[in-house]
Amino acid sequence: MRSRSSNAEGSAPKQIPRHSKFQDSIQDMKHRTHKKDPSCESEGVLPRPVSEKSHTGKGHHTEDLSRDDLLFLLSILEGELQARDEVIGILRAEKIDLALLEAQYGFVTPKKVLEALQRDAFQAKSAPWQEDIYEKPMNELDKVVEKHKESHRRILEQLLMVERSHRQTIMEMEEEKRKHKEYMKKSDEFINLLEQECERLKKLIDQETASQEKKEQEKEKRIKTLKEELTKLKSFALMVVDEQQRLTAQLALQRQKIQALTTSAKETQGKLALAEARAQEEEQKATRLEKELQTQTTEFHQNQDKIMAKLTNEDSQNRQLRQKLAALSRQIDELEETNRSLRKAEEELQDIKDKINKGEYGNSGIMDEVDELRKRVLDMEGKDEELIKMEEQCRDLNKRLEKETVQSKDFKLEVDKLSVRITALEKLEDALDKSKQECYSLKCNLEKEKMTTKQLSEELESLNARIKELEAIESRLEKTEITLKDDLTKLKTLTVMLVDERKTMSEKLKQTEDKLQSTTSQLQAEQNKVTTVTEKLIEETKRALKSKTDAEEKMYSVTKERDDLRNKLKAEEEKGHDLLSKVTILKNRLQSLEAIEKDFVKNKLNQDSSKSTAALHQENNKIKELSQEVENLKLKLKDMKAIEDDLMKTEDEYETLERRYANERDKAQFLSQELEHAKMELAKYKLAEKTESSHEQWLFRRLQEEEAKSGHLSREVDALKEKIHEYMATEDLICHLQGDHSLLQKKLNQQENRNRDLGREIENLTKELERYRHFSKSLRPSLNGRRISDPQVFSKEVQTEAADSEPPDYKSLIPLERAVINGQFYEENEDQDDDPNEEESVLSFRCSQSSSLPMNRKLWIPWMKSKEGHPQNGKIQTKSNGNFVQPGDLVLSHTPGQPLHIKVTPDHIQNTATLEITSPTTESPHSYTSTAVIPNCGTPKQRITILQNASITPIKSKSSTESLMNLEQSMSPVTMATFARAQTPESCGSVTPERTMSPIQVLAMTGSPSSPEQGCSPEPIEISAKHAIFRVSPDRQSSWQFQRSNSNSSSVITTEDNKIHIHLGSPYMQAVAGPMRPASPSAPLQDNRTQGLTNGALNKTTNKVTSSITITPTATPLPRQSQITVSNIYN
């Protein structure tokens, strides 16, 4: 305030010059106005006298003023007024104190500025005055002080927070320091462990170097042995080349033979084609005859239908004409009656005319009668016309009848002709049926021929395939020659390569030393990386452990909460059950109270109102309390439901937590796997660190290179060995091919024989056809030989009984099971041969296990399969008068007790022998004789077939051949492979005989005892022992005794069951017999059977079973001491 007063006091003397300046400006304004009007100057200077003059001279000068003058005066007055207002404002502004102005405007400035502002406010006519500005800032200052206090308080709070955070950071830093110290300790321990491992690995490397030196010495020894083997292999390769050349020469010879065989096969194919063409021509002729017969029958049936239709039409026309005749005859009778009446009327007229002429009657009656008579005459004339017409119609009808009678006669003649034709056609139909039967039989024969041709074509295809295989084998052999040559060149180049490799090895060692230095630097960098990786892994494991502990704590808490909630739920459920029981009790009470109320109201309506109201109030209060309790219970139930919902939510949360726990567990496992992987990498890096020394690594590299060299050499040696094995296999193949070639030649010969038989049959058929044509021409020359006689004339078919298929006798396979165990056969003791009551005797021989089955499957040629759909295993048993027949038996149904005669008569001059097997009764149809002439030129493999003289229905026979060999004989690889060929399952095909056979079962074991190599071959030609059984199965089988002998001389044994055993002794063999059991009709499955073994597989006979007999003469000239062998040849 002092400053304001002092400013006011100091500014007071300064106002005087301001005022003087303001007055000067007013005077200037006045001068400007007076310049416009000079008269006003005087008035301005002396206003009072002008006014006085105007007042004095008013009446004299008022009329002299014009309108413009008045307007000028008014404008002067306005200017004066404005100037007065301005002066008043200036004066007011000058009069106001400076302090008031400062208080009004709120700032301290020079006084002139404040006065100017005040003047402007007066001119603008603003608010006259305002409040004091110095009062507001004090309130605002108080507010500012309060705000400063609040901000001070907040700053203090923030400072406290900062202090707390600072303390926390200090604590964390201390914890981190502690953890760092622990980590450093662990890392020191880890480094110590690594150093220990380094030392251990160095020791291991020292041991390895020592072992490598030993290995190098061993490898040098091996290299020496390998070089020796190389020299041997080179010599062996040269031997193989020589053998291959020899084999190629043999293959060329075989090619020539195969070409000859192919030419013969082509010739047979040409013959077959001619036979097929003839058969096709006969089929075409048969089809033409059938077509002609069909056309004739169709024409005959059409003509017959037309004639029958005509006959029916004529019958209907005859009936109509007869009806018309009957009607006309009736009309004729009527007309005759009318004629009679007319004649009577004419006679009456004549009488009347006579009377008229005489004049007997009167005119009037006469005239009436005459009129009536005229009318009658007119009617009669009309009837006469009708009669004339009827007579004409009768004439026409008679003519038609005559024509129809003529036609009916013609038709009768035609019907007679047709009946004759019908009889002729019926005869033709009979002839057609017979011809159809004949055609059917011809078709059957043709189909059989087609089947045979198909089989021949299949065999030719198989031959072509075999030829192709042989060509492929030749190509393989050529390739093997080329490969052998290449291998020899490679062996030469290998020696050069080894020398070059030694030179390159020294250079590679230098390069490896350079690489070692680079790898050491890389190892250091990788070690640094590994340390960082380990730190990260340790941190991750800590995090994983923390997360595990947190998850376990959460799980524990959640399980606790869940258990508590379950307990609470159980308690609440019990409470709820109690409350529900209470509610039901209260409801029952309410119902009883309501009933009581009703009774009470009924009984006590007449009592006092006060008592009733009090009781009612009490009861109402009770009801209200009960209702309140019910509401409380409802609320509790709602709370229980809410708690159940919460429990469900907690269970869901528990499941989610379990899932999280499982996920965290998986993460922890993954991290542990990564840790293990890192540890493995660390181990690898440690190993790399251990191999720092250049000398050790040089030795290691050299070792690896030497190992690679030795592996390369061993591989080459193995390859050479494999090639040698392949050459051995090719040798085996060639041997097998030779055997197959011989078999194929046999099959070709058999096929040629078959083709000849087929040609003979076709010629016989053609002769029979020509004969039947001749018969048909002789019987019916009008039909041009179209009819063929009955099929019984030329058919060779024999009625056979159906063979009942029975299950095979598995008990007879016991010797097979006993014979083969672990790939070797048991050796039978000689003591067992002397025991006649032994149940089972096993033929044993030793088989080498080196024969491989898959190799033999390729080499095996199966026997011919069956042509008809019979069982595949070939095990069929037939019944003969109720008794089971074994699969190898040929049934001869003759009376039991009759003997069978076998006569062997050798001729020593011509080196031949004849074998006759006859039955005594030739009168019966089942008797038979079979004879054979056996040439013997001293060779052990002479064969001859026994041709049967009588035909009987064939039954499947299963003859099993036994291959026998000396126990001490050794086998070459070729014989091993050929021996194993019988073990393939492809030989188990069913075989059906087509031709008729002798009713004798021949179980044979044939072979040559001369060569030990051929003793292992499965073919029946090359088996070394001889044992034959001729068996005739009768209707009844009685108990029988079986005799055996081990003598070298031949023996013929007859038994009680009509079996004839011809045993031909050999010094190496022991006999084979089936189990000796009495076979009765009640137990047919125990039928005795004698089986042979062919390496554990059963061979089967094919469609022809022919016996071959080999005779080897002995030193004695006696006829009974020649050794005879009967064996089966498989076609």
From Swiss-Prot:
An individual GO BP term:
gene expression
Q: InterPro entries, from UniProt?
A: Cortactin-Actin_Reg (IPR050719), Cortactin-binding_p2_N (IPR019131)
User: Residues annotated as region Disordered?
Assistant: 1-62
Q: Which Gene3D superfamilies match?
A: 1.20.5.1700
- List localization entries: Cytoplasm; Membrane; Nucleus
Cited function: Acts as a regulator of the antiangiogenic activity on endothelial cells. When overexpressed in endothelial cells, leads to inhibition of cell proliferation and migration and an increase in apoptosis. Inhibits melanoma growth When expressed in tumor-associated vasculature.
Q: What is this protein called?
A: Filamin A-interacting protein 1-like
Q: Which organism is it from?
A: Mus musculus (Mouse)
Q: In the UniProt record, what gene is named as encoding this protein?
A: Filip1l
